[in-house]
UniProtKB/Swiss-Prot annotation:
Classification of source organism: Eukaryota, Metazoa, Chordata, Craniata, Vertebrata
Underlying gene: gnb2l1
Record-linked InterPro entries: G-protein_beta_WD-40_rep, RACK1-like, WD40/YVTN_repeat-like_dom_sf, WD40_repeat_CS, WD40_repeat_dom_sf, WD40_rpt
SMART domains according to UniProt: WD40 (SM00320)
PANTHER family: RECEPTOR FOR ACTIVATED PROTEIN KINASE C RACK1
Name recorded for this polypeptide: Small ribosomal subunit protein RACK1
Superkingdom in the source lineage: Eukaryota
Length: 317
């Protein structure tokens, strides 16, 4: 008996690429998705065969593509970043913006909450990383030893005993920052192309990075060293660890690869069946990934504006 993924349905509502998806353990029937249509949709998951969920509310305010969205650990707030150069904090009960964060001089590409929700980090095309408090005040701008190109992704470690920020950029670098003094702790060198994404494991012990070279590189955050590399075979747009299995998922071009990190083997490869009359048409690319908090459901956002939903099932392959 092996675990495999079974497609469960789709979520239709966006009119632009789905750039990010966020889930929260507090509300298992709700997810958020960010899009190039400038909105964030709050979905109510119905898990029907036809429609896996319905758009409950649209969070409007950004004037350009929304690049990233995350949910606070209490499930009450969302944080978004946009190509309009700002971050926004949203009250999810009312759907309104409670704070606008102004300071970046170019598109914001990535945002994150610290484990205690008291700090916010953002990465931008202006090549800086900014640390903010929840009142929207920029407390620190990392410029020393910073990326020499766009900062494509920033993430906090969930482990409060090792307070760090991990970032990656179009300079092919993965950088680990000491949160206490915002100083560079480690440079992880090895990628041969620009980087799109970095993600930290649920226990904070390792991170994975990916981008143009199609390689998912795993790094030990405690030891500050490269562990191993998994070949994705196509540009990696998104990476995420399973919350309860030793799995890493990668959005590789139009498909999703799931690796079991114990044996470094592929558990499953997810391709959506697109019926197209024109075989030259580029298949939709997978641009975002998120697991449900219980690790049973995988949500994936695409360039055809849909979210596709898979579930872990026990198979007999």
């Amino acid at each position: 008996m092996t675990e495999q993924m079974t497609v469960r349905g789709t979520l239709k509502g966006h009119s632009g690429w789905v750039t990010q998806i966020a889930t929260t353990p507090q509300f298992p029937d709700m997810i958020l998705s960010a899009s190039r249509d400038k909105t964030i949709i709050m979905w109510k998951l119905t898990r029907d065969e036809t429609n896996y969920g319905i758009p409950q509310r649209a969070l409007r305010g950004h004037s350009h593509f929304v690049s990233d969205v995350v949910i606070s650990s209490d499930g009450q707030f969302a944080l978004s970043g946009s190509w309009d150069g700002t971050l926004r904090l949203w009250d999810l009960t009312t759907g309104t913006t409670t704070r606008r964060f102004v300071g970046h001089t170019k598109d914001v590409l990535s945002v994150a909450f610290s484990a205690d929700n008291r700090q916010i980090v953002s990465g931008s095309r202006d090549k800086t990383i900014k640390l903010w408090n929840t009142l929207g005040v920029c407390k620190y701008t990392i410029q020393d030893d910073s990326h020499t190109e766009w900062v494509s992704c920033v993430r906090f470690s969930p482990n409060s005993s090792n307070p760090i920020i991990v970032s990656c950029g179009w300079d092919k670098m993965v950088k680990v920052w000491n949160l206490a003094n915002c100083k560079l702790k480690t440079n992880h060198i090895g990628h041969t192309g620009y980087l799109n994404t970095v993600t930290v494991s649920p226990d904070g012990s390792l991170c994975a990075s990916g981008g143009k070279d199609g390689q998912a590189m795993l790094w030990d955050l405690n030891e500050g060293k490269h562990l191993y590399t998994l070949d994705g075979g196509d540009t990696i747009n998104a990476l995420c660890f399973s919350p309860n299995r030793y799995w890493l998922c990668a959005a590789t071009g139009p498909s999703i690869k799931i690796w079991d990190l114990e044996g470094k083997i592929i558990v499953d490869e997810l391709r959506q069946d697109i019926i197209t009359t024109n075989s030259k048409a580029e298949p939709p690319q997978c641009t975002s990934l998120a697991w449900s908090a219980d690790g049973q459901t995988l949500f994936a956002g695409y360039t055809d504006n849909l979210i596709r939903v898979w579930q872990v099932t026990i198979g007999t392959r």
